[in-house]
Amino acid sequence: MIKPVAVDLPYPDMCDVTVSRKNALCLSPAYAAPHGELNAVLQYTYHHFNFDLVSKEVSDTLMGIAITEMRHFDILGTLLLKLGADPVITT
């Protein structure tokens, strides 16, 4: 079973986040722009497939990193919503 590759530390709490267009605009590119979280998910998944026949261990590690990036994508999307922005995917 493939497991996420991540440090076992809690993510910051978002319960005190309030609407802020300025902060949302600052963070939006990290969500789904060319160098954002979505692209990281796609790149690690792509490399996972390419390494699958070469090294199962490397392939599984790459997918574990992709899973962690998916979690970041989810967290950032939730944060953007709390900041009052639509988490638009613009790859």
Q: Could you say what each language-model-derived stretch is?
A:
Residues M1-T91:
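Non-heme di-metal
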